[in-house]
Curated annotation (Swiss-Prot):
Assembly: Homodimer.
Pathway(s) the chain acts in: Porphyrin-containing compound metabolism; protoporphyrin-IX biosynthesis; 5-aminolevulinate from L-glutamyl-tRNA(Glu): step 2/2
Protein name in the entry: Glutamate-1-semialdehyde 2,1-aminomutase
Gene: hemL
Species of provenance: Renibacterium salmoninarum (strain ATCC 33209 / DSM 20767 / JCM 11484 / NBRC 15589 / NCIMB 2235)
Family to which the UniProt record says this protein belongs: Belongs to the class-III pyridoxal-phosphate-dependent aminotransferase family. HemL subfamily.
Localization, UniProt: Cytoplasm
PROSITE patterns the record matches: AA_TRANSFER_CLASS_3
PANTHER family: GLUTAMATE-1-SEMIALDEHYDE 2,1-AMINOMUTASE, GLUTAMATE-1-SEMIALDEHYDE 2,1-AMINOMUTASE 1, CHLOROPLASTIC-RELATED
GO cellular component: cytoplasm
Keyword Isomerase found: yes
Chain positions found as N6-(pyridoxal phosphate)lysine: 269
Length: 433
């Protein structure tokens, strides 16, 4: 028995499912979850001492690679000054200045501890600001485990084939209108009926929790126009894409040049440099509705934690244009190699891209929405995953999650991935239901 198996068996005696986040249990791919003891650069090391090239990157935060020396030094210095004060610190202002300097759509910023808190607060703020109750979301878009946003969510719910979550009341669910992604006509129709009651539309800037799905040309801009016409707000969820796909997130890649601006944005992952930090920001007049001077309450003991702020500041300072250029180039290189390997084995597939994020869908030619994502041949992913794992490459343990690269993925790391792809493609081709 491996050390990971022993640890997992013990963990199941202590924690639900043996994990603290469902996808880690390897439920959709089978086998034993790897218990990670350390990470450095592009590599993870498990409890059995085996190393893996990491294509999860902590689900996005490790843009620079694991244990980046500048981030570690900043965290050490912050720890020496104290772990938590329950008071404001200079580091909060420094990180806020960096975010506002990168994302012109953000005029005010509020720090929280998780992406779920950020989206939950953004929804509450939209309702408070507009005086309306209804929220529009899109099937397959994941916005954390907020009660009102769990309907037809992607990520772990897609992995577990769950339509929603038990414990969400009918009254809560009734205030969420779920539409197909990339369908502006459906948005226009729902506003024609409910426009005066809709507080906000929330969407992932580029969905990455039903696999990666790029918004159709004009889709996000259309959402901005429709919400503005009806006095509703547009909430752009950049928890995953923010500062990961570019210096200003996905909106910086597309929205600024297309001439549309969201009212609120949410951030997480990279903004905390690997520590529990997230944020929401946007129009000053909307953000000022938050307490202490506004009527919409939000608070958190660990919001703006000084150690997390230090990690975020160090990460954003180190995330230069060269870093994004390098990650973009590696992403294009790997997605092309993945497609070639699958084509060589005659496996129908679609490599889905948005910025430097990508994923693979089996048995379909394109994924534009959640219905397409669910129609793929998911049974091919588990053998593909385990073949890569056996070759020392750690992929997301779900076909519905994005693949991530970092600035630490050098030629040696990339060559290990390339060498593993042909066998994994053969395993996918041989898979049966």
């Amino acid at each position: 028995m491996t050390s990971s198996q022993e640890l997992f068996d013990h963990a199941r005696e202590l924690m639900p499912g043996g994990v603290n986040s469902p996808v880690r249990a390897f439920g959709s791919v089978g086998g034993t979850p790897r218990f990670i003891t350390s990470a450095q650069g592009a590599y993870l090391t498990d409890a059995d001492g085996r190393d893996y090239v990491d294509l999860v990157c902590s689900w996005g935060p490790a843009l620079l690679g694991h244990a980046h020396p500048e981030v570690i030094a900043a965290v050490h210095a912050a720890v020496d000054r104290g772990l938590s004060f329950g008071a404001s610190t200079p580091a909060e202002t420094e990180l806020a200045e960096l975010v506002l300097g990168r994302v012109s759509a953000v005029e005010r910023l509020r720090m929280v501890s998780t992406g779920t808190e950020a989206t939950m607060t953004a929804v509450r703020l939209a309702r408070g600001f507009t005086g309306r109750n209804l929220i529009v979301k899109f099937a397959g878009c994941y916005h954390g485990h907020v009660d009102s946003l769990l309907a037809a969510a992607g990520s772990g719910l897609a992995t577990l084939a769950m339509p929603g979550s038990a414990g969400v009341t009918e009254a809560t669910a009734a205030e969420t209108l779920v539409l197909p992604y990339n369908d502006l006509e459906a948005v226009r129709e729902v506003f024609a009926v409910h426009g005066g009651q809709i507080a906000a539309v929330i969407t992932e800037a580029a969905p990455a929790n039903m696999g990666v799905v790029e918004p159709a040309p004009g889709f996000n801009a259309g959402l901005a126009q429709i919400t503005r016409e009806h006095g509703a707000l547009l909430i752009l969820d950049e928890v995953l894409t923010g500062f990961r796909v570019g210096p200003s997130g996905y909106w910086g890649l597309t929205g600024a040049s297309e001439g549309w601006t969201p009212d609120l944005l949410t951030f997480g992952k990279v903004v905390g440099g690997g520590l529990p930090t997230a944020a929401l920001g946007g129009r000053a007049d909307v953000m000022e509705y938050l307490a202490p001077f506004g009527p919409v309450y939000q608070a958190g003991t660990l919001s703006g934690n000084p150690v997390a702020m230090a990690a975020g500041v160090a990460t954003l300072k180190a995330a230069t244009a060269d870093v994004y250029d390098q990650v973009d180039a590696r992403s294009l290189e790997l997605s092309a190699a993945l497609s070639r390997a699958l084509e060589a084995e005659g496996v129908q597939h679609s490599v889905q891209r948005a910025g430097n994020l990508f994923s693979v869908a089996f048995g379909v030619s394109e994924v534009r929405n959640y219905a397409d994502a669910k129609a793929q041949e998911t049974f091919r992913y588990a053998p593909f995953f385990h073949s890569m794992l056996d070759s020392g490459v750690y992929l997301p343990p779900s076909v519905f999650e994005a693949w991530f690269l970092s600035a630490a993925h050098d030629d040696t790391a990339m060559n290990r991935i390339f060498d593993a792809l042909p066998s994994a493609a053969k395993a996918a081709a041989a898979a049966t239901v």
